[in-house]
Amino acid sequence: MALKHFKPVTPGLRQLVIVDRSGLYKGKPVKTLTEGKSSSGGRNNNGRITVRFRGGGHKQTYRLVDFKRAKRDVSATVERLEYDPNRTAFIALIKYEDGELAYILAPQRLAVGDKVIAGEQVDVKPGNAAPLSNLPVGTIVHNVEMKIGKGGQIARSAGSYAQIVGRDQGYVIVRLNSGEQRLIHGACYATVGAVSNPDHMNTSLGKAGRSRWLGVKPHNRGVTMNPVDHPHGGGEGRTSGGRHPVTPWGKPTKGMKTRSNKATDKFIVTSRHKRKK
């Protein structure tokens, strides 16, 4: 789908670039495949802000997307492509031969009327899901499982994908968009193709209000605050902070590594930081 630019008849339209969604279904989602969703406003169960600059935004209904593709060897037809406010990608409503409906992530080049299937042996075409070990090396995949049967976790946002680059003793080597290469068990399922809406990265919100519709509030810099609020706060007039950049909690920012070592590090074949050197 193409990008839409607008005549600058108002200041908010001057910078606005959005994805043309005219090809998507215009009605409401399937009610049995939706749930209510209450926004947290960045607060935890104690009512304290745990994520700053969140709140407001348009009310959303959660669509129950099938990341597991647990219904195996049953063909399904794509009924329609839909917008989903909870993610950057589009979703596809599929109808199995037995009449059951489900939502899946829509891959690129999936059209209404296409047939999709999940199983051990499937054709390598967009929307079909299979174990990684049964897909040929070089295949572009998305919605990749990290644990058998847990459901896809890798490559789910708009335009993202991973690529199978090799095999090793029951595991499959997968290259991610970040440049990282990981070992993933061959029995983990993945869906063929790249995720839909690749133009999402080229959009421009155009005005602050559009950010507010998404539930994002203004982000304040530390140097504009008072000393009680931030280590960079205070001073007479405008200051540069007077120290190396830190978070509101006093920890160095700008490049300090915060990731702790995990037992699963052994599955990382090539770090995403390797290519930066």
UniProtKB/Swiss-Prot annotation:
The keyword Ribonucleoprotein applies. Pfam families: Ribosomal_L2 (PF00181), Ribosomal_L2_C (PF03947). Residues 223-277 are annotated as: Disordered. GO terms for cellular component: large ribosomal subunit. Gene3D superfamilies: 2.30.30.30, Nucleic acid-binding proteins (2.40.50.140), Ribosomal protein L2, domain 3 (4.10.950.10). GO terms for biological process: cytoplasmic translation. GO terms for molecular function: rRNA binding; structural constituent of ribosome; transferase activity. The keyword Transmembrane helix does not apply. Keywords: Ribonucleoprotein, Ribosomal protein, RNA-binding, rRNA-binding. PROSITE patterns: RIBOSOMAL_L2. InterPro entries: NA-bd_OB-fold, Rib_uL2_dom2, Ribosomal_uL2, Ribosomal_uL2_bac/org-type, Ribosomal_uL2_C, Ribosomal_uL2_CS, Ribosomal_uL2_dom3, Ribosomal_uL2_RNA-bd_dom. One of the primary rRNA binding proteins. Required for association of the 30S and 50S subunits to form the 70S ribosome, for tRNA binding and peptide bond formation. It has been suggested to have peptidyltransferase activity; this is somewhat controversial. Makes several contacts with the 16S rRNA in the 70S ribosome. Part of the 50S ribosomal subunit. Forms a bridge to the 30S subunit in the 70S ribosome. Belongs to the universal ribosomal protein uL2 family. This is Large ribosomal subunit protein uL2. It comes from Azorhizobium caulinodans (strain ATCC 43989 / DSM 5975 / JCM 20966 / LMG 6465 / NBRC 14845 / NCIMB 13405 / ORS 571).
